[in-house]
Amino acid sequence: MSSSKVKAHKVHLLIEEIPTIEQMKKSFLDLYDGWKCPSCGLEDETFDHVWTCDEHRSLLLKIKNNTIDLLLSLLIEYNPDITDYSALLMLNIWTISTDPDNFTFVDLIKGFIPLELTQILNLWIQLLLVIIEIRQYIYEQTFKEIWIRRCSFIKEFERSLGITKKKKLTLKNFRPFNNILNSDRELEYKFDALDSIRNNIYFGKNIIEFYSNLTS
């Protein structure tokens, strides 16, 4: 996959807009209405469900454990004097679930690095290179082991039903004009919001105040 496609996919992860079944229903409801998760066949395939689906649990546990092993090996490499990792291992980020009040491993998949993690790592090492390596490892493993497999299955299933890219484009082109306008406005709003977030972070403004203004 080209670097530009990788960057685009990482942005879609960050804003939870990878093409899940629920996301595809927004553009192709006639095609995907009634479809469930392609892995378990039981639940709606939302962004969170892709990673927390019971069919993916063993894979995600393996990726999580390997991530911890990689992180510990990097810490030992950069600082062999560390002897107690309990504070790091007790963080909620190693939980395989979603939580509106706490960061979990699903948030690491999105690309977020929680402050509580950086605060602990900062006590031991210069953390930038470690964070970059850990983020990339999580991205590559979840992409290859979960997302690519899921997409390959969907493509084969759609092909068996005669659903082609041309058919999707035909259906999408017949969306009501008002829906197209609303979709364009929504996309423009999202990009404006992302630019505002970036500027608030870059220039040290109050991010909480920004969110309050954005949602008021």
Predicted regions and their residues:
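Family-specific functional microsites
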Residues: 1-216
